[in-house]
Amino acid sequence: MIKANLQLFAHKKGVGSTRNGRDSESKRLGVKRGDGQFVKAGNILVRQRGTKIHPGLNVGKGKDDTLFALVDGRVKFSRLGKDRKQVSIIPA
């Protein structure tokens, strides 16, 4: 009687895990309504982190610095000095 000495080996080499392969979900920040566009009260104008763009007439600011329209009207972007921007709503 012949006894077979059968040994099984891995046919693929074991590999370690990587520390890459993750990324956070985008926050969809930016200007949501353009200059001259008609908006209704409550419409979001700008989503931002910090006050890159400041609220002007008829524009409110949320706790996360989101700018939104307080009245119906047209959007108006303007500059305040050299490095400051502002968005206002001109009532229709």
Curated annotation (Swiss-Prot):
Posttranslational mods: The N-terminus is cleaved by ribosomal processing cysteine protease Prp.
Gene Ontology cellular component annotations, sorted alphabetically: cytosolic large ribosomal subunit
Alphabetical list of InterPro entries matching this protein: Ribosomal_bL27, Ribosomal_bL27_CS
Pro-sequence residue ranges: 1-9
One MF annotation (Gene Ontology) recorded for this entry: structural constituent of ribosome
Keywords associated with the record: Ribonucleoprotein, Ribosomal protein
A Pfam family recorded for this sequence: Ribosomal_L27
Highest taxon in the source lineage: Bacteria
Residue ranges of the TM segments: none
Gene Ontology biological-process entries: translation
Family that this chain belongs to: Belongs to the bacterial ribosomal protein bL27 family.
Protein name from the UniProt record: Large ribosomal subunit protein bL27
Organism: Acetivibrio thermocellus (strain ATCC 27405 / DSM 1237 / JCM 9322 / NBRC 103400 / NCIMB 10682 / NRRL B-4536 / VPI 7372)
